[in-house]
Protein backbone atom coordinates (compact mmCIF):
# COMPACT_ATOMS: atom_id res chain seq x y z
CA UNK A 1 0.00 0.00 0.00
CA UNK A 2 1.31 3.44 -0.93
CA UNK A 3 1.88 5.86 1.93
CA UNK A 4 3.21 9.33 2.59
CA UNK A 5 4.75 11.01 5.61
CA UNK A 6 2.52 13.24 7.71
CA UNK A 7 3.18 15.76 10.47
CA UNK A 8 0.38 17.47 12.38
CA UNK A 9 1.65 20.27 14.59
CA UNK A 10 -0.14 22.83 16.75
CA UNK A 11 1.31 25.83 18.53
CA UNK A 12 1.66 23.62 21.63
CA UNK A 13 2.75 20.22 20.40
CA UNK A 14 3.26 17.73 17.62
CA UNK A 15 0.12 15.59 17.53
CA UNK A 16 1.12 13.14 14.85
CA UNK A 17 4.21 12.15 12.94
CA UNK A 18 4.27 9.04 10.80
CA UNK A 19 3.15 7.33 7.64
CA UNK A 20 -0.45 7.66 6.45
CA UNK A 21 -2.49 6.30 3.58
CA UNK A 22 -5.11 9.09 3.61
CA UNK A 23 -5.96 12.45 5.20
CA UNK A 24 -9.31 14.26 4.97
CA UNK A 25 -9.58 17.86 6.20
CA UNK A 26 -11.94 20.83 5.98
CA UNK A 27 -10.41 23.42 3.68
CA UNK A 28 -11.82 26.86 3.07
CA UNK A 29 -13.26 25.61 -0.24
CA UNK A 30 -14.72 22.41 1.23
CA UNK A 31 -13.44 19.00 2.26
CA UNK A 32 -10.17 17.87 0.75
CA UNK A 33 -8.82 14.34 0.60
CA UNK A 34 -5.10 13.67 0.33
CA UNK A 35 -3.80 10.34 -0.95
CA UNK A 36 -0.25 9.33 -1.90
CA UNK A 37 0.69 10.98 -5.20
CA UNK A 38 -1.53 14.04 -4.62
CA UNK A 39 -0.58 17.21 -6.49
CA UNK A 40 1.44 19.63 -4.33
CA UNK A 41 -0.66 22.39 -2.79
CA UNK A 42 -1.04 24.77 0.12
CA UNK A 43 -4.49 25.59 1.48
CA UNK A 44 -6.05 27.15 4.54
CA UNK A 45 -7.98 24.95 6.94
CA UNK A 46 -11.21 25.93 8.61
CA UNK A 47 -12.31 24.66 12.02
CA UNK A 48 -13.44 21.07 11.95
CA UNK A 49 -12.59 17.40 12.04
CA UNK A 50 -9.56 16.02 10.28
CA UNK A 51 -9.43 12.28 9.64
CA UNK A 52 -6.11 10.52 9.30
CA UNK A 53 -5.84 6.91 8.18
CA UNK A 54 -2.51 5.51 9.30
CA UNK A 55 -0.47 3.08 7.23
CA UNK A 56 -1.74 0.18 9.38
CA UNK A 57 -5.40 1.06 8.67
CA UNK A 58 -6.26 2.76 11.97
CA UNK A 59 -8.17 6.02 11.79
CA UNK A 60 -7.56 9.03 14.01
CA UNK A 61 -9.97 11.95 14.28
CA UNK A 62 -8.38 15.29 15.18
CA UNK A 63 -10.05 18.65 15.76
CA UNK A 64 -8.25 21.65 14.22
CA UNK A 65 -9.35 25.22 14.83
CA UNK A 66 -7.81 26.37 11.57
CA UNK A 67 -4.36 26.50 10.06
CA UNK A 68 -2.47 25.54 6.93
CA UNK A 69 -2.23 22.26 5.03
CA UNK A 70 0.79 21.73 2.78
CA UNK A 71 1.12 18.77 0.42
CA UNK A 72 4.46 17.84 -1.12
CA UNK A 73 5.15 14.72 -3.23
CA UNK A 74 5.94 12.49 -0.22
CA UNK A 75 4.93 14.67 2.73
CA UNK A 76 1.79 16.27 4.21
CA UNK A 77 2.23 18.94 6.87
CA UNK A 78 -0.57 20.46 8.94
CA UNK A 79 0.25 23.59 10.90
CA UNK A 80 -2.80 24.09 13.11
CA UNK A 81 -3.67 27.02 15.34
CA UNK A 82 -5.10 24.54 17.85
CA UNK A 83 -5.34 20.78 17.43
CA UNK A 84 -6.68 18.07 19.72
CA UNK A 85 -7.47 14.42 19.30
CA UNK A 86 -11.24 13.95 19.31
CA UNK A 87 -11.18 11.61 22.30
CA UNK A 88 -9.57 14.41 24.37
CA UNK A 89 -12.37 16.92 23.72
CA UNK A 90 -14.66 17.46 26.72
CA UNK A 91 -18.20 17.42 25.35
CA UNK A 92 -19.84 18.89 28.47
CA UNK A 93 -17.44 21.87 28.52
CA UNK A 94 -18.00 22.46 24.81
CA UNK A 95 -21.79 22.38 25.20
CA UNK A 96 -21.46 24.90 28.04
CA UNK A 97 -19.23 27.14 25.87
CA UNK A 98 -21.79 26.95 23.07
CA UNK A 99 -24.59 27.98 25.43
CA UNK A 100 -22.48 30.87 26.74
CA UNK A 101 -21.76 32.06 23.18
CA UNK A 102 -25.45 31.85 22.27
CA UNK A 103 -26.33 33.88 25.37
CA UNK A 104 -23.69 36.48 24.47
CA UNK A 105 -25.32 36.88 21.05
CA UNK A 106 -28.69 37.60 22.64
CA UNK A 107 -27.31 40.16 25.08
CA UNK A 108 -24.87 42.08 22.87
CA UNK A 109 -25.29 45.08 20.62
CA UNK A 110 -21.57 45.85 20.17
CA UNK A 111 -20.25 44.58 16.82
CA UNK A 112 -16.91 43.47 18.30
CA UNK A 113 -18.63 41.44 21.04
CA UNK A 114 -21.06 39.94 18.53
CA UNK A 115 -18.17 38.85 16.29
CA UNK A 116 -16.36 37.32 19.29
CA UNK A 117 -19.53 35.42 20.25
CA UNK A 118 -20.00 34.20 16.66
CA UNK A 119 -16.39 32.97 16.54
CA UNK A 120 -16.82 31.16 19.86
CA UNK A 121 -20.09 29.63 18.68
CA UNK A 122 -18.53 28.43 15.40
CA UNK A 123 -15.63 26.83 17.29
CA UNK A 124 -17.99 25.05 19.70
CA UNK A 125 -20.13 23.73 16.85
CA UNK A 126 -17.03 22.48 14.97
CA UNK A 127 -15.77 20.72 18.11
CA UNK A 128 -19.14 19.05 18.69
CA UNK A 129 -19.21 17.88 15.05
CA UNK A 130 -15.72 16.43 15.54
CA UNK A 131 -16.88 14.52 18.62
CA UNK A 132 -19.84 13.12 16.65
CA UNK A 133 -17.58 11.98 13.81
CA UNK A 134 -15.30 10.30 16.34
CA UNK A 135 -18.21 8.53 18.05
CA UNK A 136 -19.73 7.43 14.71
CA UNK A 137 -16.54 5.75 13.56
CA UNK A 138 -16.15 3.76 16.78
UniProtKB/Swiss-Prot annotation:
The keyword Cell membrane applies. One of its GO terms (cellular component) is proton-transporting ATP synthase complex. One of its GO terms (molecular function) is proton-transporting ATP synthase activity, rotational mechanism. It is found in: Cell inner membrane. Keywords: ATP synthesis, Cell inner membrane, Cell membrane, CF(1), Hydrogen ion transport, Ion transport, Membrane, Transport. Gene3D superfamilies: ATP synthase delta/epsilon subunit, C-terminal domain (1.20.5.440), F0F1 ATP synthase delta/epsilon subunit, N-terminal (2.60.15.10). It is a peripheral membrane protein. Belongs to the ATPase epsilon chain family. Produces ATP from ADP in the presence of a proton gradient across the membrane. F-type ATPases have 2 components, CF(1) - the catalytic core - and CF(0) - the membrane proton channel. CF(1) has five subunits: alpha(3), beta(3), gamma(1), delta(1), epsilon(1). CF(0) has three main subunits: a, b and c. This is ATP synthase epsilon chain. It comes from Psychrobacter arcticus (strain DSM 17307 / VKM B-2377 / 273-4). The lineage of its organism: Bacteria, Pseudomonadati, Pseudomonadota, Gammaproteobacteria, Moraxellales. The gene is atpC.
Amino acid sequence: MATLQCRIVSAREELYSGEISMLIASGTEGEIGILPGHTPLITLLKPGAMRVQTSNGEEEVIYVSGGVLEVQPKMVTVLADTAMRAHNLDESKIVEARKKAEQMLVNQSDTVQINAALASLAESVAQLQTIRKYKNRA
